[in-house]
């Protein structure tokens, strides 16, 4: 990135420590809701806020101008062992209103993806499965994993009588405990 490199006295290849410290000073700052106005002022690109898992935060994201919300626990890196993100999705979608909600966290199969779409997610991210495929089989392995996830989603929809994603979304999810 030429803009980032212009902040450095030496190229990162020559002084990696300085590059790391500059990166941390530039991008490692704590962000607050008040920063959204600045973000909106410096770009015409859509702003998607990731890590929104509470309906109050979803409403605040919409109020501050987020173009989309990414309901995610960041792959469990930030805090592991909390409430499953899928259990939070419906409330986030409801609070977001017409603002699109994307989802990831624990998506390991086509079934997981279809459930998230039925709960209102507009799109579903898949993290670990394709990286496992990549590690084991390179690009072909990653492609195989993604094809398998899509095939499972298609099969689940077909056997349950939903020919399209619109049908899945219209049906929603009913959860029974007990």
Residue ranges and their predicted role:
Residues 1-103, 110-132, 168:
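Alpha/beta enzyme core
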Residues 31, 137, 160-163:
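Short coil/turn linker and secondary-structure boundary residues
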Residues 81, 85-95, 134-155:
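C-terminal helical cap(s) of enzyme catalytic domains, especially alpha/beta-barrels
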């Amino acid at each position: 990135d030429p803009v980032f490199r212009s902040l450095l006295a030496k190229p990162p290849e020559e002084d990696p420590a300085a590059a790391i410290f500059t990166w941390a000073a530039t991008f490692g700052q704590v962000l607050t809701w008040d920063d959204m106005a600045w973000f909106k002022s410096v770009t015409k690109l859509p702003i998607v806020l990731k890590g929104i898992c509470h309906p109050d935060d979803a409403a605040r994201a919409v109020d501050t101008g987020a173009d989309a919300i990414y309901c995610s626990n960041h792959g469990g890196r930030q805090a592991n062992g909390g409430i499953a993100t899928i259990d939070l999705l419906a409330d986030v979608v409801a609070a977001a209103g017409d603002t699109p909600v994307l989802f990831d966290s624990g998506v390991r199969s086509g079934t997981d993806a279809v459930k998230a779409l039925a709960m209102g997610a507009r799109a579903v991210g898949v993290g670990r499965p394709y990286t496992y495929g990549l590690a084991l089989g390179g690009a072909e392995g990653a492609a195989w994993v993604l094809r398998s996830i899509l095939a499972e989603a298609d099969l689940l929809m077909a056997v349950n009588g939903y020919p399209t994603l619109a049908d899945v979304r219209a049906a929603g999810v009913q959860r029974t405990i007990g």
